[in-house]
Amino acid sequence: MAAQRELYDAIVIGAGIQGCFTAYHLAKHSKKVLLLEQFFLPHSRGSSHGQSRIIRRAYPEDFYTQMMAECYSLWAQLEHEAGTQLYRQTGLLLLGMKENPELKIIQATLSRQGVEHQCLSSEELKQRFPNIRLARGEVGLLEVSGGVLYADKALRALQDAIRQLGGIVHDGEKVVEIKSGLPVMVKTTSRSYQAKSLIITAGPWTNRLLRPLGAELPLQTLRINVCYWQEKVPGSYSVSQAFPCFMGLGLSLAPHHIYGLPSREYPGLMKVCYHHGNNADPEERDCPAAFSDIQDVHILSGFVRDHLPDLQPEPAVMEHCMYTNTPDGHFVLDRHPKYDNIVIGAGFSGHGFKLSPVVGKILYELSMKLTPSYDLTPFRISRFPSLGKAHL
């Protein structure tokens, strides 16, 4: 078949936000690129669906805050190219106890990196945001440039751009076999392809593709409950009322972050979620028998009742999303330990969407054997000492 003889510069497996930005950078640099997606687009099986994500520079680590500087400009560039709004500035409010160490570290990082922010006392918070109820000793850190990314619009814009730049997008094609070598061979349910390099951005399916290639990453796949809460007075927590996105840090009732953003999906509802979930195989994420524990919803109900009194304290809508977590919460951006023309982008741990413009650029650079634009030490596979040679 002609398709088998055709040689691509790169094949990208997985058309979530990371794979789309990787293919976009490849196509922008005039590379012959094929983007493969096992499901028909758009779909809600992975980690990139839905209408909204938080964008922020507020991180404890300098390297993420530095990467975000370029991400903001690349998001703006995509907005301009697509002729549609992909980002809305709302501000990001971090809530925590005054002595919370993570809050202090984030504030220090923002100061060091020259990111505009404001430290708000309990009194100032009450004046600025009267519909947030605070516990005694809670303070706020407002990152001015934080806001909302329109996730579904971003995916569509990228897929359109890839095609316009000459890239090829094939959905409804599941990869069934990868043969390492030069060229690398990729067999799907429809046909076979070959390429000089392969980039795997397969989210919770990553290890299914890596195991036959002699590698396995320490990835934990979680099903997240995405909860929407009804406003008692419509509009009280809306963008039009200048209500920000928020993150609750170090809360006594919640071992993990709680985050929220003004809802665009459902008018009159606000998205408030817990940054953790239950272990789940991505193939079985919709099986109710697998998920008896909805402790996170109880945690969220308590938070809403205590902090957001103008919301009903029970979720009105609950949807699902997948996280693919690493032990340290940092990404994997690296070449396969044995095959240097196979590149892996994985383990985005529930905070990768906003960083995808730079992640895609890095994966493009790795696949083309270019010097990466950023120090990849935090993202190397070798940081996992438990991965002995037997795994690789």
From Swiss-Prot:
Annotated positions of the N6-acetyllysine modification: 126
Coiled coil (UniProt feature): none
Keyword line: Acetylation, FAD, Flavoprotein, Oxidoreductase, Peroxisome
Location of this chain's protein in the cell: Peroxisome
Intervals of motif Microbody targeting signal: 390-392
GO MF terms, alphabetically ordered: flavin adenine dinucleotide binding; L-pipecolate oxidase activity; sarcosine oxidase activity
Predominant location category: other
One Pfam family per UniProt: DAO
Superkingdom of the organism of origin: Eukaryota
Cofactor note: Binds 1 FAD per subunit.
Catalytic activity: sarcosine + O2 + H2O = formaldehyde + glycine + H2O2; L-pipecolate + O2 = L-1-piperideine-6-carboxylate + H2O2 + H(+)
One GO process term, biological-process aspect: L-lysine catabolic process to acetyl-CoA via L-pipecolate
GO cellular component, one term: peroxisome
Residues noted as binding FAD in the record, renumbered to the chain: 9-39
Co-factor requirement: FAD
Keyword Secreted: no
Function: Metabolizes sarcosine, L-pipecolic acid and L-proline.
Similarity comment: Belongs to the MSOX/MTOX family.
The protein, known as: Peroxisomal sarcosine oxidase
